[in-house]
Structure formats: C-alpha cells, structure tokens
C-alpha cells in the first residue's frame, strides 16, 4: 500500500483546505505579530543611532510605544493561537467522521485482510498523530514561513551582505533535512507496524483469555509480548536517534550564519556600511530569523512520523467501497413495506446461476454453484467443513461478489440493488451470536431500532426467552457485557432469534444456529426457529442433520460443488454423500 503523503488525492489535505480560512486568519495575525517585533526592533535601532549622534531621545514616548506594541502583540498572538487550535480541531473532527463513515461502507474483504488491532490502532493512535501534526508541526511550519519572510525582508533592507550570510547555509539545511526525512519515514513505517503487532497480541490475549488460561499459554503469550515490546523499543530508539540527530545538526547549522554575520558586522560597521543602531537591530532579530528559516525543514523532519500515520489513514479512505447499484426494493410480504419504494413479488426469491468464487485468485471455493429458491421454501445446505457453505451466506448478504456467474435476488441482479435495501430483506442468526455491550432490550432492538417495548417483548416470547429475561433482577434493562459472556450459548441464541423476529424480513439465513447447543436447549431453540421461519423463505446451514429432516430441499456441497439435492428421504434413498453423512451422524 502506498503510504506517501499524496498531495493530489489526499482526503486529509481536502479537509485542511475546507477550513483554510481559519488558518489564513491565524497566519495574518501571526504576520502582524512578527511585524510588531520588527517595528519594535526598528524603534530600538533608530533611537540608538539618534543617541550616538547626540540627538535628543524621548524615553517616555519609546516606553509608551513598547507597552502598546507588547500588549497588541500579546492579544494578537493569543487570538492567532486560538484560531490555529480551532482549525486543528475542525479538521480532525471532520477527518475522523470521514474515516468512521468509511469503515461502514468499506468492502468486507478489507476487514478480512487487515487485522482488527491494526484497524483499531489506525483509528485511534494514527488519528492522534494526525492531530499532533496540525497542532504542533504544521503550525510550526507555517508560522516559521511567515516569520522567515518578514524577517528576511527586514534584514535585506538593513544590509544585503548580511542577508546573504544568513541564507548561505540553507542549501545544506535542505540537503540534510531531506536525508533525515527519508530515514524518518522508513523507520516510522516500521514503527507503526511494530505497534500494530504488539496491539495484535494484546487483542488476541483479551479475546482468547479463557483459552490461554485453560491451555496454560500465559508464558507463551508473555514471551510473544516481550519479544514484540523489545522490537518496538529498538525501532523507537532508532526513531529517537534520528530526531536527536536532527536537533544536533540544526543547532550546529544555526551557528554558521551567526559566526559569519559576527565577522561581517564588525567589518561593515568599521567601513561605515552599517550603523551601530542597525547592528543592534540586526543582532536582536538574527536569532529569530535563523531559527525560523532553518526551523522549516527540520519541522518537516519532526512531522514525518505523523505524515506516515496520515498515509495509513489514507489507506483506509482509498480502500474499495462496497459496490452495488442504487435500486431500492422491498418484498411484498414485509410487514413494514412503504408505498414510495418499488415492490417485488417474484416467484424465485434467490437464484444462483453458475456461481464461482475465490478468496485468492486461482483457488476457487465455489465452482459452478446453481440453485433456485422459491418464495416460502425451507432450504438446508450441508457439507463437510470448508465445502463453501459459509461462503454462500457471505455472497447472499452481499459481503462478497461472485468471481463469475449471476446472483439474483427477487429476480434482480444483486449488482443492481442498493445493498442496504437488499439486506433489509434478510435476517441472520449465526452460530456465533454477537451481543453488544448494553441492555438486553437494546441488543434485541438492533433488529428494528424503532420497535416499541411491547414489540420487543412479543418477539422475546416467540423466541422463548421472555421468561428468562423477566426472571433477571433488572429484566429487559439488564446490562450485558461485550459478547454477552454472562449468558449461556442457548440464551444468546434465543436473543439473536428475537432480534431476527423483530426485524421481520422475508428471508432468513440460519448459520448452524443449534450446532453448539446441548440437546435440552436445542428443543427450545428449534421451537423458536419454527416460529421465526413460519411463512418465510429460510436457508439453513446445518451441522446436526437431524434438525433439517423436514426441509423442503437439502443441498449437499462437496469441495465447492453441489453434488446432491433433494428432500431428506430422496437423499437417503440415493445412498450417496448425504446418506453417508447422516449415517455417520
């Protein structure tokens, strides 16, 4: 992934330009402050020459001017700082929202390829670095530029020779800073990857805490973390070394114009080309001029690490979006259909025609898969692990596109659908039920955000979970932790079923909903599923073949191909793959 700070197509810069009026105002105020410094310097310079020539000097007037200029400079500097901070906050807030929205639109394959810890690190740590770029480095760069221009004009007017002496070392500064920028960029990329790796281990340790304890893997994970931490520290030391080298070089280079100007000033004063007052004014402004002009490239060196982080964030924003059409439809048997939407009433709800799919090029997971599902049919998909069952569900949900072949939903090619509209026609109950941190009612209401409490209760009654919830101290307001770890597998499944009931969609996708449930709980869940599937088109990935005997049709997958299809009885009579699987079960 190209992580260079791309000026042509960079969302971060677009956000910077969006609020550029704020930073322009801050720059103008900063320019006025620097002009005030120059004006104060001129007052000192002129009055020293007056005093040395024997002319009278009004000390009181000079003090009044200095007080006025100092107060004005303080007020304007404060206002400029506030505007600069406001600019940074606005840009980062807009950029953060842009990234957050992108994460909901991004193609599902991005999440498959990027680690969870890496994405979290980018969204949190890299955003913080981007904010640091605006509040510290960018502000320093632009204020140094305005200051350098104003001071350069002042020094040039005092004496051109001194001006040349100040800028003579600048090519050396540019050359050295470019070298340091390249080194810092390379090291910063490695550093961010090391941080990702360490956070990845943390994430694994937290998510797999029970397994780690059960299998005694504490030492193994401690060693992994120790190694990752050491590698991170080593990279950080290199990064710090480059930064410290930049500081030392900057200080050494700053001495070059100072030494040159010291000798030249003596010669210019002696030759009468420079007055004592001008010399004093030059000496006072010299440090600020040198600091600002040399500070620009070295501020870029310091900002390089932040630019790498911005490049990583741009990687998210440049990732492929889910690509589908813009047509919006609802099936006629959805209870909450609205009149302003196109309504479909096709005989065939789902059609797969010679579907091929590969996660990696050349390694097909599905090969020439074809089937049609009528409205109201109860279909089961069975097969050995890795046969392509879950992949079919991912294609049905629009998480992936088929490599070849056609997938139609209600007679319309899936690529023509608005994907959100397509998914509104489906509800998923998975074997790995995910519950969000929050109350039980909130988790169920994700099926229909606008549902009333009574509707939630009715859904729970149909899902055979209402009595359990009512038995809890806080009932539906019971707060559950991430993943619902304090609930049993069966309880989580029934909450997921209640969520699907509340969504009230014509198509149900059931991904082995009873595979990890004991037989006692299985009957409760099966009863809930029967209520859920009544009058709906349902597709079930089955692990326990005993649960799908009543399916209208069973599709048998093997190595990504459909090898058999029929009713339970028909498949047993064939004596093929299904019969063998059923006998083994």
Regions found by a protein language model. Name each.
Residues 66-77, 170-174, 243-257, 263, ...:
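Hydrophobic alpha-helical segments in the permease module
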């Amino acid at each position: 992934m190209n992580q260079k700070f791309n000026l042509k197509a960079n969302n971060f810069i677009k956000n910077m330009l969006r609020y550029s009026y704020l930073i322009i105002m801050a720059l103008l105020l900063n320019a006025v402050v620097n002009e005030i410094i120059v004006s104060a310097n001129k007052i000192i310079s002129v009055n020293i020459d007056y005093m040395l020539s024997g002319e009278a000097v009004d000390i009181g007037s000079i003090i009044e001017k200095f007080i006025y200029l100092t107060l004005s400079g303080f007020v304007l500097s404060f206002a400029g700082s506030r505007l600069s901070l406001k600019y940074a906050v606005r840009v980062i807030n807009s950029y953060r929202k842009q990234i957050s929205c992108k994460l909901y639109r991004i193609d599902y394959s991005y999440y498959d390829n990027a680690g969870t810890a890496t994405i979290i690190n980018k969204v949190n740590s890299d955003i913080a670095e981007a904010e640091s770029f605006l509040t510290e480095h960018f502000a320093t760069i632009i204020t140094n530029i305005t200051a350098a221009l104003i001071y350069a004009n002042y020094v040039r007017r005092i004496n051109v020779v001194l001006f040349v002496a100040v800028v003579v070392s600048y090519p050396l500064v540019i050359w050295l800073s470019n070298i340091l920028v390249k080194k810092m960029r390379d090291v910063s990329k490695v550093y961010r990857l090391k941080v990702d790796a360490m956070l990845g281990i943390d994430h694994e340790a937290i998510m797999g805490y029970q397994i780690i304890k059960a299998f005694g893997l504490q030492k193994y994970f401690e060693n992994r973390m120790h190694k990752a931490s050491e590698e991170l520290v080593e990279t950080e030391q290199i990064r710090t070394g480059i930064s410290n080298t930049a500081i030392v070089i900057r200080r050494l280079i700053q001495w070059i114009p100072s030494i040159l100007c010291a000798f030249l000033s003596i010669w210019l004063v002696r030759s009468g080309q420079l007055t004592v007052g001008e010399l004093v004014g030059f000496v006072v402004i010299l440090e600020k001029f040198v600091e600002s002009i040399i500070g620009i490239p070295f501020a870029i060196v310091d900002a390089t690490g932040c630019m790498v982080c911005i490049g990583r964030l741009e990687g998210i924003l440049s990732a492929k979006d889910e690509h589908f059409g813009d047509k919006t439809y609802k099936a006629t048997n959805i209870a909450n259909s609205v009149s302003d939407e196109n309504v479909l009433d096709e005989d065939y709800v789902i059609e797969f025609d010679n579907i091929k799919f590969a996660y990696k090029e050349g390694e097909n997971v599905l090969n020439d898969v074809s089937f049609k599902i009528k409205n109201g049919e109860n279909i089961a998909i069975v097969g050995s692990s890795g046969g392509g069952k879950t992949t079919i569900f991912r294609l049905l949900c629009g998480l992936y596109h088929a490599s070849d072949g056609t997938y139609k939903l209600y007679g319309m090619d899936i690529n023509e659908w608005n994907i959100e509209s397509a998914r509104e026609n489906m509800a998923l109950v998975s074997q790995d039920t995910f519950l969000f941190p929050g109350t039980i009612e909130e988790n169920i209401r994700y099926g229909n955000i606008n549902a009333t409490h009574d509707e939630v209760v009715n859904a729970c009654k149909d899902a055979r979970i209402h009595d359990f919830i009512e038995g809890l101290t806080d009932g539906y307001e019971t707060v559950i932790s991430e993943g619902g770890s304090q609930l049993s597998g069966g309880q989580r499944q029934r909450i997921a079923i209640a969520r699907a009931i509340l969504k009230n969609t014509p198509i149900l996708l059931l991904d082995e909903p009873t595979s990890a449930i004991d037989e006692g709980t299985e009957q409760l869940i099966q009863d809930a599923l029967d209520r859920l599937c009544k009058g709906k088109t349902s597709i079930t990935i089955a692990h326990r073949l005993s649960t799908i005997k009543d399916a209208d049709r069973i599709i048998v997958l093997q190595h990504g191909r459909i090898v058999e299809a029929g009713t339970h009885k028909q498949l047993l009579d064939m004596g093929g793959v299904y019969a063998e699987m059923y006998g083994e079960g």
